[in-house]
Every structure is written in C-alpha cells, then in structure tokens.
From Swiss-Prot:
Signal sequence extent: none
HAMAP family registered for this protein in UniProt: RNase_II (MF_01036)
The protein's name: Exoribonuclease 2
Functional summary from the UniProt entry: Involved in mRNA degradation. Hydrolyzes single-stranded polyribonucleotides processively in the 3' to 5' direction.
Xref: PANTHER family: EXORIBONUCLEASE 2, RIBONUCLEASE
BP term (GO), one: mRNA catabolic process
Sequence intervals crossing the membrane: none
Broad class of enzyme this protein falls into: hydrolase
Length: 644
C-alpha cells in the first residue's frame, strides 16, 4: 500500500535533501579507517566498514552522520574513481586471479581476470596492466578489474623500466621505419666541410645533435657557427616517421638507456654529427662583441659539415684546467677549444649582467650492471666543457627566437611568465618579513624579476629562494613569442636538439621557410599540449625508475650507521623530505624521528621550518647528517633519521 504513495516519496525526497552531504577525496590510512578530505582544513572520519566501498583517492559524495559530537562520512556516490587504468602485481593463478595495485596506499588485492584475446597464462608475481570494471559505489557488489596487458615476470631484473613505461603508457622501443634518401628541399647548402667543427658530449653519446666552430675577428669580436643535425632533411612533414615523432614528442632518457623519438638509424647514425663523416646541417652564424652581446647580423643557413673531433666533456674540462693527460689531437682542435672557452666566458658574463644564470647543480648518473643492478651513483658536476656547450646552445636559441619572432611572428617558444600576478602582493609581503623590499607591480616585469633573482642569489643561503618558489608560474610551450623570466630573456625558442625534441623539428622547418623566403604555416596549439603532456610523463617515468634504483642501491645501508649529508628540500606536517647530496636520492624523515614529544614539535610547510619548543631547529635548504632507517622496496620509499 505504501508502494506508490506520493506523500511517502515526498518525505523521502525531503529527508534526502535535508541530510548533510560533502564532496571530497578519500584518504586511506594503514589502519583500515580513512578520511574524506573536503578541503585543506576540513575532513571527515570514514569508519573501516565504509572504507570497503571506496578506494584511496576516489572523489566521492558522502552522507555526513553526527553521533555524540563526532562526525563520520558514509560514501554514497562516486564522482571520479582514483583507479581506472593501473599497473600491479598478480596474485593466485589461472582461474582465481587478483591484482595488487602498485601504489603505496593501495594494499588490497582486487579480484580480476584476463581480458579476452590476451594470450598469457598469468601466474603469481607477474606484473600486468589492468583496468577497473566494477566499483561498489556504482551498484556493483565489489571491486573487479580486467587484466589488459602482460608486462613481465616478477623476477625480471628490468622490472623498474618495463613497469614504469607501462604505467605511463610510454613506448618501450625505438620507432620502426627507415629513411632511405634525403628530401629535395630546394635549399642551397653551404660547404663548410673544411672548417674545424667539433662536438663535445659524454663519452657514451651516440646521438650528437650539435657541432661548434669558432673564429677570432678584428676588434676583439668572435664568430660562432652552431651547426645542428638536420633530421627534417630526411623526414617529410606528415610522413609516417614524422607522425611517430610527433606522438613521442621527445626522446625518453631513463637511467641506463633511452627510447629515441626517431629510429636509431637516424638518431645515432645518419643524422648524428659523427667525427669525420659529412653530414647535412642547419646552421646559425653569429658575431659576439667584446662584452658578449650577440650582434644583429644573425644568419641562418643550410650547410654540410664534417666534424673533425668527438670531444668528451671531462677531458676538455681537464685540459682547460691544466689537469689530466688528455691532449687535443692537433693544434687546430686546441685552438677551437680555446676560442670556445673564450665565447663561453663572454656569454656567461653577458647573461650574468643582462639576463639570469642558473646555479650549477650536479647531474647524477646511475652506473648499472648487465642485470640492471646499481653498481654506483656518481655526481657529475657541471664543468667548463658543459658550460661551453650550454652557452653556445642558449645563444643559438636566442638567435632562433629573434629570427622567428621578427620574420614570422610565431614558432615553438619556451615561455615562462615569472610570478603568478595573483601572488604578487603575498610575495612582496613575505620578502618584506625577510628584509627585502620589492614593488608588487615591478616584480611582474622581466627587469623586476631579474633584479629580485640577483638579490636572492646574493643571499648567504637559498632559504628565501625556496620560500618564494611556490609563487612562481610554470614554464609553458607556446606558439606565440613571449618572455622566459627563468632565463631572464625576452624570447627563447629551441632548435638545437631536433633528434630528440619534436618542437625543435618544427622550428627547423620554420627556419628553413625563412631561409628560402617562403611563407610558413603557424603550428597548431594542440601540438604544444601534446609536447607538454609528454614532457610531464617522461619526467615522471625518469623519477619513478630513479626511485626504484635508489631503493635498490640504499637497501643494504638500512639500519647501518652509514652517514649521508642531506639537504632539506621540503617540510610538511608529517616530517621532512631530504635529498642525499652524494647521490641525489630523496628520503623522508617522519616527524617522530625529529622529536619524541609531538606537542612540542611544529613542522610548518608555510614557513619551511621545524620548531621544537618554539626554537627553529631545521629549515629548508639546511644540510644535515642522516642515516638510512628503512628502505621499503614495495613502495620504493627511503626512510631516514637525523644523526643526533
């Protein structure tokens, strides 16, 4: 009799509309209960039985119950699931399979089966890609997943690489395809094969993008020719190879190996500027005045060159610093190295005075055995030879940015707008508390930004610099010319790595149109979105593989008294993140390791400090000694403890 009662339906509707609800993200804990985080300040308790309906990271709407002053959340509706496609480890075998997602806060095995047409008999320990098919908040009885791809077996030494690439849905190998002959582009190529061009790279580099030639001119001027590998001489726009490169957008550099954007035959051979091999190039000729200014007579042209020597960073640096036993093979090569060092010096000074120079941070290199084991991790400081190449490339990219802006009005530009205008007042207020006075309007201009950066660089520590990083906007890829505040430049467009960056290939085609006096089509904005997304995924992949290898490397140090110098990089409510100075590993120090009495401890992300009994004991950028307390291989987490 109550079945179709309109009054009852109305009452139900009223009760439903009056019941308090909240939307937020589920945060799981290791204790079985969880929280519904509505915003930074408000969260609701989710009891263990209710947590069985949801997963860490799910965005849900929940009913809020109040009992005895305590509020709790009952999940009601799924807004956005945390897991859709994921990687994990298979449990069980054949007809009774489950998969445990590879995520630090997802511990429960999800029942699953292999998708139709997937011809692999899954067994315990296998790694797989899965997709969620059922969710309790969608009216299903339980969670259920489908295995869509076999990655590798559990004991494969190369699990970190294969699992990471599958997680981010990235290619595992070089693209297929060959380029048999050069295109007829209607370009006249200048013959520069007689000039003493040199390449400077790591000893193991095969994909040499750039060769340099320097010459002294009257009036204390210097000429620099930057010659860049020319893959667009082989790859036609819109061709199969071009489309593959467009999707990949970049060569993916992972510890131990790379997955190239172009077929290796092109990247490591036909286009690579190998010593004593004639190669087509796109080149830029520029004149530098005595103070390092790039004069206005910039010239882009097509050419053929023959590199006369493959030089190695460390050997060149040693020779310039009068150490080591390496010698240039001829006086002509020695003269090139001396002139290039002079150019580097001038350009470095010019950028220091008129733009911005990054602080040198070492690169960390993993030395791996044949089975992917980490033999060592070495810090490679950026030395004079690295800076020679860097200054030449930055100068060449400044030239391209100017020419594309003035001749076409578009290109693929790296744009960085400095501080987000919405943060300008907060930034000025923060700086004021540290004794630096800036105008909130001025700091949004390129000159104002550069002025502030120079003041920050002159500070005794990097603490204040670390505090203002959160106010900065992100660098973007744009088809529109715009400033790059981070470099302190009015415009910056890269073209010096076309073997490994698709955006540089686009700029090559645009520069060739300028050389030939032809009209060019503006690149579509979608390509910049694809490039930004690929760059993000590649960086995440590099970080994930690195985390795995760091965990492997430091595992046997856990529980020993081995000390490591570590820089504090971040402070949060739960503790501190530190970077080990010698090898670059990131470790976490939980708050209880800092001080036993929680009420006397304040970890402030806002201030970048840790206070104990009101005294600042640690701050971001401090370098402290730590030992490794624990390495959790299943989450690749490294837990450290400060040395008392």
């Amino acid at each position: 009799m109550f079945q179709d009662n309109p009054l009852l339906a109305q009452l139900k509707q009223q009760l439903h509309s009056q019941t308090p609800r909240a939307e937020g993200v589920v945060k799981a804990t290791e204790k079985g209960f969880g929280f519904l985080e509505v915003d930074a300040k408000k969260s609701y308790f989710i009891p263990p039985p209710q947590m069985k309906k949801v997963m860490h990271g799910d965005r849900i709407i929940a009913v809020i119950h109040s009992e005895k002053e305590r509020e709790s959340a009952e999940p009601e509706e799924l807004v956005e699931p945390f897991l859709t496609r994921f990687v994990g480890k298979v449990q069980g075998k054949n007809d009774r399979l489950a998969i445990v997602p590879d995520h630090p806060l997802l511990k429960d095995a999800i029942p699953c089966r292999a998708a139709r047409g997937l011809n692999h008999e899954f067994k315990e320990g296998d790694w797989a890609v899965a997709e969620m098919r059922r969710h309790p908040l969608k009216g299903d009885r339980s969670f259920y997943a489908e295995l869509t791809q076999y990655i590798t077996f559990g004991d494969d030494h190369f699990v970190p690489w294969w699992v990471t690439l599958a997680r981010h849905n990235l290619e595992k190998e070089a693209p297929d395809g060959v380029a048999t002959e050069m295109l007829d582009e209607g370009l006249v190529r200048e013959d520069l094969t007689a000039l003493d061009f040199v390449t400077i790279d790591s000893a193991s580099t095969e994909d040499m993008d750039d060769a340099l030639f320097a010459k002294a001119l009257p009036d204390d001027k210097l000429q620099l020719i930057v010659a860049i590998a020319d893959p667009t001489a082989w790859i036609a726009e819109g061709s199969k190879l071009d489309k593959a490169a467009k999707i990949r957008a970049f060569t993916n550099y992972l510890p131990g190996f790379n997955i190239p954007m172009l077929p290796r035959e092109l990247s490591d051979d036909l286009c690579s500027l190998r010593a004593n091999e004639v190669r087509p190039v796109l080149a830029c000729r520029m004149t530098l005045s005595a103070d390092g200014t790039i004069e206005d007579n910039i010239e882009f042209f097509a050419a053929t060159i023959e590199s006369k020597a493959k030089l190695v960073y460390d050997q060149v640096s040693d020779w310039l610093e009068n150490t080591g036993d390496w010698q240039p093979e001829s006086e002509a090569i020695a003269e090139q190295v001396r002139l290039l060092a002079q150019i580097c010096q001038r350009r470095g000074e010019w950028r220091h005075n008129h733009a911005l120079v990054f602080k040198d941070r070492p690169d960390y290199r993993f030395i791996l055995g044949e089975k992917g084991e980490v033999l060592d991790i070495v810090a490679e400081p950026r030395r004079i030879a690295n800076r020679i190449v860097e200054e030449a490339m930055i100068a060449a990219n400044i030239c391209a940015a100017r020419v594309l802006r003035d001749k076409l009005g578009f290109g693929i530009y790296n744009v960085h707008m400095g501080f987000d205008p919405a943060n300008a007042d907060a930034l000025a207020a923060l700086l004021k508390t540290h004794g630096l006075h800036v105008d909130a309007e001025e700091v949004l201009t390129l000159d104002g930004f550069c002025k502030l950066r120079r003041e920050l660089d002159a500070q005794p520590t990097g603490f204040l610099d670390s505090r203002i990083r959160r106010f900065q906007s992100f660098a973007e890829i744009s088809t529109e010319p715009g400033p790059h505040f981070g470099l302190g430049l009015e415009a910056y467009a890269t073209w010096t790595s076309p073997i490994r960056k698709y955006g540089d290939m686009i700029n090559h085609r645009l520069l060739k149109a300028v050389i030939k006096g032809e009209t060019a089509t503006r690149p579509q904005d979608e390509i910049t979105v694809q490039m930004a997304e690929r760059r993000r995924l590649n960086r995440m992949a590099e970080r994930d593989v690195g985390d795995w290898l760091y965990a492997r490397f430091l595992k046997d140090k856990a529980g020993t008294g081995t000390r490591f110098a570590a820089e504090i990089v971040d402070i949060s409510r739960g503790g501190m993140r530190v970077r080990l100075v010698d090898n670059g590993a990131i470790a976490f120090i939980p708050a209880p390791f800092l001080h036993a009495v929680r009420d006397e401890l304040v970890c402030s992300q806002e201030n970048g400090t840790v206070q104990i009994k009101g005294e600042t004991v640690y701050k971001v950028t401090d370098v402290i000694d730590v030992t490794i307390a624990e390495v959790r291989m299943e989450t690749r987490g490294i837990i450290a403890r400060p040395v008392a």
